[in-house]
């Protein structure tokens, strides 16, 4: 009881004395406490100038408050009464302002000199102070002590190089002071005793020691000469010297608005460079800081020794030995080939000489010609030169003619065109080379076949990872509707017959650039496989054992530049593998059509009526999923990322498999443009909802429908909607259709009615799976305030198209990567229950195709809306409340207490707090409104407490 009473008494006393000033002057004490801390909590460390400045500042502030609030506080009234009688109201204010300015000049003399151009001569102030003190001494008595002018402004000791000059100045001042003291002692102690003489000597010794301890201010020239060399060239040392001081010298250094000269608080022997190399390095650094036109040409020595890494020396030596061995093998093979070529040339020359000797004459046309061996040799040399310059196409045209070589035993033969034997020999050599080349080509084709088989095996393994997800989809034939015709595939456009040509040279170039860039960052490894898809090419890079995966992730921008790509995505590591996936966009991106997915065997063989087409994977195979297994889907993507195209493909894939009896759709489109094309199709449960208030009503009624279905399944003793429909088929009852709720823009709903929308989506996502109600929620802004923790926890399956920032990808996928997508339907899909991320490319369906399908469905059957989903439950509560005949609800008083205590007036909040139904909660809210406790709902549906 004492502490609160004491505090209240202090508060009242403070308010009585200072009035309005009592609310503000404690902040002045914070600054004073900081300055007191810097003075080591000793009042003796303050200069008289600072004490006078602090006192004048406090008094001038108090006087200003007295001028503005003359009737507030006893001290303020007293100060105002005194100064107003002397100076008047306006004069008191001007005097307070001038006194405040004077206090600032006293506290910050250097700042005032630089900024305000005000400089005070403190010697005059000291003379005024001395005159005032002597006046007081004469009036009240006491000794008139002479104060030393230099003592009022203590100066921090400075270490100087000019110690001799300082010592000389000290000796001069010491002699002057000692002479003055001796004269004072002689005048005052002529008739003193021996004791007084000894005391005077002690005082003399003390004063002499004090004079020796004092420093003398040096002029600016000596200060510049004495400045430390390291201080002059090192900003870090200057900062450290300023921060290392235990207490500052003046308030100008505490609040250092302008640059001041350094204070040498560290002995110079610790800062001075010890070696000549250090001084040269300082000169070099100073020279490099200068502009180019002032810079000197300093040669910086560069060590020629190679810096070898200390770690992995054995591995590096082994690698160097292997490289040397490989080079030696290549040189040995080249040497062997040269020996074989020389042997072949020698044999050919022997054959030519033998043929030249045996063939004495060679017929050209119808005439004889006798050629000597020398001429034959020259002709062979010329023919060799000619054939070397010929194109290699001659080898391909060898078999276009049949050269005839015969031994001539008679003088005449029919005129047949016979070529020179030398050319024939060369042609035989070319045929041998051609046969060898064909054999090597056949061997290369065999090896290429083996490589293709290996690549197909790797591709099959990659497909097997996606097939593991596709195998979870239930296989079988879907039951076709009897009284409804599903739309044919002819409404969808055929894909263009354009086979993707794999440019191996471009892929090899990208692999080389990738490995070269990684090698420059000292990351070893190799690309073990490459997959070419319709949109991206994936390189599987296996790093060395000593490489961290995080290092590769940090090089994403550098690899993007090296591969000359718009953006790349690095998956490190690929789940289930010891490799890193680097996905690079293709130069030509193929368009994926919806008809390709709907015609695929994966989509046709799926038994589930809620099979939706998601697109193609990175290899180019169709990828679908079952909405029942998801069971809800959260989609995010910026404008232009292909999000709306992907949602349209999902809707069309549902319409191609279901009649209105097996599937009903509820579309919520606050943007009013995306789903307007689907109006009046027979599958719609309500018209396309564009009003946020109607959307909240529809979601609340969907929760009521979920509860109704659970009651029906509980009565039928079934666990899910499939078993319930089978049982109703046997009993001849009414089946329950699947309901898919599609919300195109969640952010707009969260802005208008965030809490209610979050509550209803959370309830549907938690419980609606077994009742056959599924959600597809899309948003352009996947921030934390839109995709809240409740929504994110209950929507485990997510698709992210291209987003703007890494944090958005982290929110929607719990991983990075969506910011590096390409747009145009490029997306990442996280299946439920797995941590892997599948990259997909959404199919495209034009508006013309959608219009044809919608018109076909409208012609099949007219739409039947269920208007009960759009009714406002609050209006229902009003009608039921009017039927109460004035009787209040049993929980009326408790509800009134909850609303008044918590300050929340929503129906859903009261429903959760009292654990009652929605209708009863709405009735209680309406009763509170009629009784004047709550207001009518505003445009946002919120009520105020009256």
Curated annotation (Swiss-Prot):
Residues that bind ATP: 640-645
Alphabetized GO MF terms: ATP binding; DNA binding
Membrane topology field: Multi-pass membrane protein
Cross-referenced Pfam families: FtsK_alpha, FtsK_gamma, FtsK_SpoIIIE
Stretches that traverse the bilayer: 15-35, 50-70, 86-106
Compartments (UniProt record): Cell inner membrane
Assigned protein family: Belongs to the FtsK/SpoIIIE/SftA family.
Described purpose of this protein according to its UniProt entry: Essential cell division protein that coordinates cell division and chromosome segregation. The N-terminus is involved in assembly of the cell-division machinery. The C-terminus functions as a DNA motor that moves dsDNA in an ATP-dependent manner towards the dif recombination site, which is located within the replication terminus region. Translocation stops specifically at Xer-dif sites, where FtsK interacts with the Xer recombinase, allowing activation of chromosome unlinking by recombination. FtsK orienting polar sequences (KOPS) guide the direction of DNA translocation.
Quaternary structure (record): Homohexamer. Forms a ring that surrounds DNA.
Protein name: DNA translocase FtsK
């Amino acid at each position: 009881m004492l502490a609160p009473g004491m505090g209240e008494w202090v508060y009242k006393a403070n308010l009585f004395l200072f009035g309005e000033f009592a609310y503000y002057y404690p902040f002045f004490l914070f600054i004073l406490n900081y300055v007191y801390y810097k003075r080591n909590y000793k009042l003796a460390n303050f200069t008289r100038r600072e004490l006078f400045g602090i006192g004048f500042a406090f008094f001038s502030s108090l006087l200003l408050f007295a001028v503005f609030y003359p009737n507030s506080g006893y001290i303020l009234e007293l100060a105002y009464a005194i100064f107003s009688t002397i100076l008047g109201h306006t004069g008191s204010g001007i005097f307070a302002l001038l006194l405040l300015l004077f206090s600032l000049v006293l506290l910050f003399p250097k700042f005032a000199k630089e900024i305000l151009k005000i400089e005070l001569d403190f010697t005059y102030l000291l003379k005024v102070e001395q005159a005032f003190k002597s006046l007081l001494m004469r009036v009240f008595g006491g000794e008139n002590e002479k104060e030393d002018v230099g003592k009022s402004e203590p100066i921090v000791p400075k270490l100087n190089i000019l110690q001799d000059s300082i010592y000389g100045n000290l000796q001069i001042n010491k002699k002057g002071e000692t002479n003055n003291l001796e004269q004072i002692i002689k005048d005052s102690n002529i008739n003193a005793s021996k004791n007084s003489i000894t005391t005077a000597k002690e005082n003399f010794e003390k004063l002499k020691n004090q004079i020796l301890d004092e420093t003398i201010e040096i002029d600016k020239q000596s200060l510049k000469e004495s400045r430390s060399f390291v201080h002059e060239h090192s900003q870090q040392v200057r900062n450290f010297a300023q921060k290392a001081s235990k207490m500052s010298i003046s308030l100008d250094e505490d609040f250092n608005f302008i640059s001041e000269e350094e204070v040498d608080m560290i002995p110079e022997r610790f800062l001075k460079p010890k070696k000549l190399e250090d001084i040269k390095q300082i000169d070099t650094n100073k020279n490099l800081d200068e502009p180019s036109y002032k810079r000197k040409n300093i040669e910086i020595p560069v060590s020629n020794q190679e810096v070898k890494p200390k770690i992995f020396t054995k591995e590096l030596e082994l690698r160097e030995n292997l490289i040397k061995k490989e080079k030696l093998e290549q040189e040995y093979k080249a040497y062997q080939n040269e020996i074989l070529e020389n042997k072949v040339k020698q044999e050919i020359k022997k054959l030519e000489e033998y043929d030249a000797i045996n063939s004495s004459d060679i017929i050209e046309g119808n005439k004889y010609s006798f050629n000597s061996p020398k001429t034959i040799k020259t002709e062979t040399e010329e023919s060799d030169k000619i054939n070397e310059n010929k194109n290699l196409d001659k080898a391909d045209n060898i078999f276009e003619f049949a050269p005839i070589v015969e031994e001539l035993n008679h003088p005449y033969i029919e005129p047949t065109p016979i070529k020179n034997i030398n050319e024939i020999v060369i042609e035989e050599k070319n045929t041998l080379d051609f046969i060898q080349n064909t054999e090597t080509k056949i061997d290369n084709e065999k090896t290429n076949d083996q490589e293709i088989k290996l690549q197909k095996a790797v591709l099959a393994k990659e497909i097997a990872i996606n097939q593991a997800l596709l195998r979870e989809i239930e296989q079988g034939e879907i039951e076709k509707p009897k009284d409804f015709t599903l739309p044919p595939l002819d409404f969808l456009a055929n894909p263009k017959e354009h086979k993707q040509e794999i440019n191996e040279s471009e892929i090899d170039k990208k692999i080389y650039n990738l490995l070269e860039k990684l090698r420059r960052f000292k990351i070893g490894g190799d690309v073990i496989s490459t997959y070419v898809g319709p949109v991206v090419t994936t390189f599987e890079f296996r790093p060395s054992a000593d490489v961290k995966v995080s290092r590769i992730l940090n090089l994403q921008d550098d690899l993007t530049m090296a591969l000359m790509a718009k953006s790349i995505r690095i998956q490190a590591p690929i789940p289930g593998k010891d490799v890193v996936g680097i996905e690079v966009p293709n130069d030509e991106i193929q368009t994926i059509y919806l008809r390709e997915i709907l015609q695929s065997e994966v989509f046709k063989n799926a038994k589930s009526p809620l099979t939706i087409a998601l697109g193609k994977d990175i290899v180019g195979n169709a990828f679908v999923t079952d909405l029942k297994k998801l069971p809800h889907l959260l989609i995010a993507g910026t404008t232009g990322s292909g999000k709306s195209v992907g949602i349209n493909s999902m809707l069309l894939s549902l319409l191609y498999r279901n009649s209105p009896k097996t599937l009903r759709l509820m579309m919520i489109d606050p943007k009013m443009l995306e789903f307007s094309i689907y109006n009046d199709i027979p599958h719609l449960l309500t018209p396309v909802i564009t009003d946020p208030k109607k959307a909240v009503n529809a979601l609340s009624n969907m929760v009521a429908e979920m509860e109704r279905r659970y009651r029906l399944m509980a009565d039928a003793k079934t666990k899910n909607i499939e078993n319930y429909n089978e049982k109703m088929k046997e009993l001849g009852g009414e089946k329950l259709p699947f309901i898919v709720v599609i919300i195109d823009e969640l952010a707009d709903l969260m802005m208008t009615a965030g809490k209610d929308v979050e509550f209803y989506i959370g309830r549907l996502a938690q419980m609606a799976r077994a009742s056959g109600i599924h959600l597809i929620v899309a948003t352009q802004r996947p921030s934390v305030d839109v995709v809240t923790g409740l929504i994110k926890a209950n929507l485990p399956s997510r698709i992210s198209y291209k987003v703007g920032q890494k944090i958005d990808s982290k929110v929607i996928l719990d991983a990075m990567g969506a910011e590096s997508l390409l747009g145009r339907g490029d997306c990442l899909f996280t299946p439920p229950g797995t941590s892997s991320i599948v990259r997909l490319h959404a199919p495209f369906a034009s508006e013309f195709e959608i219009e044809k399908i919608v018109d076909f469905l409208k012609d099949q059957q007219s739409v039947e809306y269920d208007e009960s989903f759009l009714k406002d439950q609050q209006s229902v509560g009003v009608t039921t409340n009017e039927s109460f005949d004035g009787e209040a609800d049993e929980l009326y008083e408790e509800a009134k207490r909850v609303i008044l205590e918590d300050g929340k007036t929503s129906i859903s909040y009261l429903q959760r707090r009292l654990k009652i139904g929605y209708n009863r909660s709405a009735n209680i809210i309406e009763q509170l409104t009629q009784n004047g406790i709550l207001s009518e709902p505003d445009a946002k549906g919120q009520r105020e407490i009256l």
